[in-house]
Amino acid sequence: MSGNSSTDLYLFKKSLKELKGKKGKGTELISVYVPAGRRLSDISQYLRQELSQSSNIKSKTTMKNVQSAIEVILQRLKLLKEPLEMGVIIFAGMIPRGGPGTEKMEVYVLEPPEPVKTFVYRCDSLFYTDPLEDFIQDNEVYGVILVDRNEATIGTVRGKTITILKKLTSGVPGKFKAGGQSARRLERLIDDAAHQFMVRIGEYATESFMPILEEKKLKGLLLGGPGNTKNEFAEKDYLHHELKKKIIDTFDLCYTEEFGIRELLDKASDLLRDIDLMKEKNLIQRFFKELIKDDGGLSAYGEAQVMKYLEMGAIDTLIVTEDIGITRVTVKCNNCDITQEVNVKTNEMFKFEEQLKTKACPTCGGAMYIDEEKDIIEYLSDLCNMHNTDLIVVSTDTEEGSQISRAFKGMAAILRYKL
């Protein structure tokens, strides 16, 4: 059950981050995007033409590296089975490890989370990763408009991310104590200023949301704020008529800006139950409800306890934060082949490698070496699959995810039964 979208998305984001950090010595890194359903023989033929043309490159070193990268990609294409429902993305090239002469061929084959639509062949000093950014964008977007007499906030909720697009202030004056014609004149001025403010909000909302609507990604609009201003804004013709059709509901709020958006999401939780942000929030709240029980309920937390219970098959749902930063390392003896598995903080891997050089095998005294390194979330995903456990990778951009990261070192769980 662990092979879920949150784990796949985390690993895809991690690969993207690594790829963006790669840089070639010259324009010799190859990026190939193969569209879904495209015949691999057509792609191979195109690459062979590029291989032939690369002989015209003036620099012998660059020519050799480009040709090596194309040949590696051709070899990888032979290993793929058709049809490719999602397509495939391949990166290859010589990446320097240090000074001149330290270059090493690196190749990455990615299965995209969504179908590749367009064929791309690019040779550059960097891998071409721009299309990958589109894959990690959540397709369902909710627009948010918070409005009161004095200010307004326009934003979006996309997956786990809240983005404030625009903050506006009205300049509408407060009430004055005046009588007769002065009172009526001031009232007209205030009403006109309020009307103009609503017009501005509508214009910015149209500018912000119409492009998303045209891409068919706008799931709906949520309006909120204190008082009656939001209702007036919703009922009158301040919004583009196509956006008015997307209004889901209006909500009474105490705040505007980001606090207001979070308050609105709480109040709209039943409507938004399916979006990632609410799923995450509800799951973590479920964990905390167990935690505060007198006997700790069905909660577990911390690396040691969670790993123990997971290997026992006692965990129903495992919660891990994206920033956990741990690598699962398999250490092996070069003499007797005894192995050990340990968790190492990713930013301390160099220190661990240096310390390992001075350690001897506990069985035969032989030298120890690192046999395998694996991202802890990928390792946990495999374990969860074995034990029918749900693995949810949560963002630390949310308040709840940040709590799991800070208080429980990025790892918490809900048990199947009391231990």
Curated annotation (Swiss-Prot):
It comes from the Archaea. Its main location: cytoplasm. The keyword Transmembrane helix does not apply. GO terms for cellular component: cytoplasm. It is found in: Cytoplasm. Keywords: Cytoplasm, Protein biosynthesis. Pfam families: eRF1_1, eRF1_2, eRF1_3. GO terms for molecular function: translation release factor activity, codon specific. PANTHER family: PEPTIDE CHAIN RELEASE FACTOR SUBUNIT 1. Heterodimer of two subunits, one of which binds GTP. Belongs to the eukaryotic release factor 1 family. Directs the termination of nascent peptide synthesis (translation) in response to the termination codons UAA, UAG and UGA. NCBIfam families: aRF1_eRF1. This is Peptide chain release factor subunit 1. The gene is prf1.
